[in-house]
Amino acid sequence: MTKIERALISVSDKNGVLEFARELSALGVHILSTGGTAKLLLEAGLPVTEVSDYTGFPEMLDGRVKTLHPKVHGGILGRRDLPEHVATMAEHGIGNIDLVCVNLYPFEATVANPDCSLEDAIENIDIGGPTMVRSAAKNWAHVAIVTDSADYPALVGELKANGGRLAKATRFELAKKAFTHTAAYDGAISNYLTSLAEGVVAGKPERVAFPNRLNAQFIKVQDMRYGENPHQAAAFYRDLDPAAGSIAHYKQLQGKELSYNNIADADAAWEAVKTFEQTACVIVKHANPCGVAVGPDTLSAYKLAFATDTTSAFGGIIAFNRPVDAATVEAVTGQFLEVLIAPSFTEEAKAIIAAKKNVRVLEIPLESGANRFELKRVGGGVLVQTPDIRNVGLDELRVVSKRQPTPQEMSDLLFAWRVAKFVKSNAIVFCKDGQTAGIGAGQMSRVDSTRIAARKAQDAGLSLAGAVAASDAFFPFRDGIDVIAEQGIKAIIQPGGSMRDEEVFAAADEHGIALVLTGVRHFRH
């Protein structure tokens, strides 16, 4: 193992770097540094040699050239096991650099600002940093490359335990992380530049929503026993910077390892329950809600959601948007479930659920956030779209019927509309008093989804008198309205936009139904 005797430290993210440098110095490591990093370390009283003094060549061109020098890169790239390299380095007065600690200019943060000019973006493209990172990573057998401040404590511990040396395996892991770091950095630059309006070479160019070259990087969280089916291999990857409050932030408190289907269903349940301001419970089966309700507390919300479809809830995923207490867990564990999700659980609740060792229990921070893009693979390519995060307010709704909805109906219509967004198309949702009363999902014809929702309500013994209906897309014919009217439902919310809208509107008036248009469609496939 190579003993670390000289380190070059030059970082944009200075979190923890002072303590790291102090520990290296205490181990007798000679520190080289540049710019703001050197200033920080010197002001802290650490012995530091500026790279310009080490190379005998000043920083120049507004800092664009700092470390691009043979004495730096020769010291990083030289192989200690090749006599020719050792002799050449000695001939030219090039000393070994055994550790490189570098992270890069904050390019992504810079271009995230909509007012960022092309000039600002270009000036935040790091040149010397990635060059040193790649050089050190290439020569990982002899040089340690540190790009992540989270690694500082463990590296210091290993250096102290091994007389200032890092194991070969450690250096290799650091090199893999380094190349991942530079790949993501270059990908971000490519994404930005290829998103600029064609022909614009200055100022603040207009950006297109989707770059001509889409670079994305994900980190593997876990391998899975299998995928959607046992004959399929699978793994779960997260974004480098996952959306706030997303499934990628889950903390598993107990239970078996999450499966591919568990994560897909848990994501559907969690994204749905997060959209409600009131205390809510969502039960999901095969990525479709089979019961949703709001209530004064989690127990009430669960009982109402479960009552929608007790059969489909078997083996489902249950999500809450409030902390879960012991009484709720007592009720929930009375059914067979795969996953239970909430922002938190009381200690009493955890003790009760612990008896159900196979139940997977997840805590996820209740925060707002959405993926920048949604990706769907197709043969030979990928479909990319922005996420469906559109909600409608009262002021956006348009009543097109003679009958106006009552205040309670309007409240239920907005509730049903939120639920419908998370049901696979064609989606029909019946609701009453903040509870789903019947859900028809995934049918090829809208009227069939309507009939299924009606049958589900009948099977559950739920009265549809005074209930409302939501449709994720327009009614292409009046038949869906007629079936809804047969159930005694007197208010419907839907996007509108069919070529037969007038026929549909007339059917609503014929049945005395209040018909509300959103102007927004929520297809989900």
UniProtKB/Swiss-Prot annotation:
Gene3D superfamilies: 3.40.140.20, Methylglyoxal synthase-like domain
Domain of life: Bacteria
Record has S-adenosyl-L-methionine as a keyword: no
Chemical reaction(s) catalysed: (6R)-10-formyltetrahydrofolate + 5-amino-1-(5-phospho-beta-D-ribosyl)imidazole-4-carboxamide = 5-formamido-1-(5-phospho-D-ribosyl)imidazole-4-carboxamide + (6S)-5,6,7,8-tetrahydrofolate; IMP + H2O = 5-formamido-1-(5-phospho-D-ribosyl)imidazole-4-carboxamide
Keyword Hydrolase: yes
GO cellular component, one term: cytosol
Keywords: Hydrolase, Multifunctional enzyme, Purine biosynthesis, Transferase
MF-aspect GO terms: IMP cyclohydrolase activity; phosphoribosylaminoimidazolecarboxamide formyltransferase activity
GO biological process entries: 'de novo' IMP biosynthetic process
Pathway: Purine metabolism; IMP biosynthesis via de novo pathway; 5-formamido-1-(5-phospho-D-ribosyl)imidazole-4-carboxamide from 5-amino-1-(5-phospho-D-ribosyl)imidazole-4-carboxamide (10-formyl THF route): step 1/1; Purine metabolism; IMP biosynthesis via de novo pathway; IMP from 5-formamido-1-(5-phospho-D-ribosyl)imidazole-4-carboxamide: step 1/1
Note on domains (UniProt): The IMP cyclohydrolase activity resides in the N-terminal region.
Family under the similarity heading: Belongs to the PurH family.
PANTHER family: BIFUNCTIONAL PURINE BIOSYNTHESIS PROTEIN ATIC, BIFUNCTIONAL PURINE BIOSYNTHESIS PROTEIN PURH
Protein name: Bifunctional purine biosynthesis protein PurH
Organism listed in the record: Chromobacterium violaceum (strain ATCC 12472 / DSM 30191 / JCM 1249 / CCUG 213 / NBRC 12614 / NCIMB 9131 / NCTC 9757 / MK)
Species classification: Bacteria, Pseudomonadati, Pseudomonadota, Betaproteobacteria, Neisseriales
